[in-house]
Amino acid sequence: MTHRYADLCRAAAAALEAVLPTTQPQAMVGFDGFVDHIIDVVAKRESRTSYTTTPTIADLGAKITAAAGKSANFELVTRHSKIGGNGPIMANALCSHGCKVTAVGILGDKVIDSVFAPLAERAEKIISLGAPAVTDALEFGDGKLMFGKLFPLEAVTYQRLLEAVGGVAGLKDLLRTPRGIATVNWTMTLELTTIWEHLAAEILPGLRADRPLWFIDLADPAKRTTADILAALAALGKIQSFADVVLGLNEAECRQICEVLALVWPTAATEWEAAEQACVQIRERLKLSYVMCHLVRSSAVAWNVAWNVTRASGATHGSASADGFWVAKPKITTGAGDHFNAGFLTGLMHGIAPAQCLQIGGATSGHYVRTAESPTRAQAAIFLRDAAG
């Protein structure tokens, strides 16, 4: 079913406003971590402190092509460094929404890297598995080139996780109380499927009387083989035995999962209705509690669980979709999906209806891309009321 846009925005705002300020659900997020360096490629050095930049990717490409068979030297200037990685960005957004967050990832060797200092100040607890990965983002007027140094992600293993948290007992303590758990960036974290399998076999059985929400972000699985994707989806089925798995996808990821599962992308009047039907198909095939898809302009979700936090109410089976909060000239786009995921998971942790959680996710992302800042719950509610008119 689709929902009238303004009414849904108002209902989502009211649901957020009804959450007491003292309500702070616990969340655990892992396991990646990146330092993103934003870099200029110098065209002309004018002085020690002044230079002009290479304006476009095409200009840089022409210079590189001209150097073939010869050699060339390019000066790179780091303008600033910022927090990166699906986990840290999502964790930071959850903190802004008032959650008590434990962030686990490759956040620093021996000491937490300074780029993660704002997250370390806001989170309840930080657990580092090693030095962060690095992305060099060369920015131009017509786009950006991102060069990743991913070797540190090899430190994200089940054995290293055990060592960092104090063994099996420590890992059980880590997962015993959070209302929401998020394990993200599966594509780059090559051992994450194995970690899920160990958790399902050795840690989760008998651990809790309740079923936490377990958010999954595959993060561009096109880079992985079909066999790897199917193995990951099978591991999620094992996690589902002990938790309500929330599979979060963007449109490209949703289409790829449909392809891997031999499902046909639906034809519908609107993009969000097509995505809603796709979410229903994927959820029914995988037998997960939730499958959510956020598109550039809209979003959709399918569920089969009593969504109210008390499990005493809430439709146990359904789907929803809605138009979103697209803006022509965003201030920032990197991290927009992570913010949507944080807002959506926050809503679910508060027992808010999934259709309204879509708009809370959209408002969280919408505020972020317009301001480059993670919104509070109150700011997300204001955004929703403004959107409703």
PLM regions with names:
Residues N92-S96, T346-H350, A363-R370:
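Short glycine/serine- and small hydrophobic-enriched flexible loop segments
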